[in-house]
């Protein structure tokens, strides 16, 4: 019998980088804080593994898989929850669809996978001129929440392209919808570096875990003129015989590091009623009760900071 090959890089990425169960709680709380009700429809742009979409639907089930909070704790939307996962790569979406079917069973139909440019996918009532490709955009629902996580907003390099995306996202939202993205910055974001972290996967969602592995995040180069960052992800996976299988350049990114003022200003210019920066902060004197998620007016000069940016329609 042939030896099994190394795990799919998408699987390793899912375990090393993403925390979808936490993300769907965060997205729900943001919406509830801003709109005083629970969201039902999530759209995940640049979806990749579509982990947030799967977790969104899983959390709505009373028998949610282990690792996902049941909707009763976070949501009154319950069985009304559905998700739309948009990505341009067919192989990645096929992997994500198989994972959704495995984890969600008959509820997998509540996640719709759409292959295409995020700028070509819109509700029918939001469609203006034909997309340059000539293809009619698929009919999709307006979203309560559009998520652009894993720093995917940095794929846009030019101001006019980012502005066009924000305008499009606003049109794709329901009347009280919000756009949520995350960003990072600080001196550490511009420094050449390699960060290593050991990952010991423990199944929490009913899916088999890959072998233990090392996750390596490399910031290979930074261009101060264009504010562009060359990033790579590598993996070194444990083998049964004690060796390792190395997957170099499993993922590569050419990102423009947008600043928080640029992002909030462009959101407002795109027609959003408000644009806010949110962070997790912690008051050590309050212990577990000291964790706070909410808007901030200032971020101190940290070596590397992380933040959410919310466009409020």
Mark where each language-model region is:
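Conserved SAM-binding loop of SAM-dependent methyltransferases across substrates and taxa
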Residues: 49-79
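Conserved SAM-binding loop
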Residues: 96-97
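Conserved SAM-binding strand-loop segment of SAM-dependent methyltransferases
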Residues: 104-124, 128-131
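A short acidic, Gly/Pro-enriched loop at the edge of an enzyme's catalytic core
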Residues: 124-146
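A short glycine-rich, Lys/Arg-flanked "PGG" loop and its adjoining helix->strand segment in the class I
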Residues: 162-175
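SAM-dependent methyltransferase
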Residues: 181-265
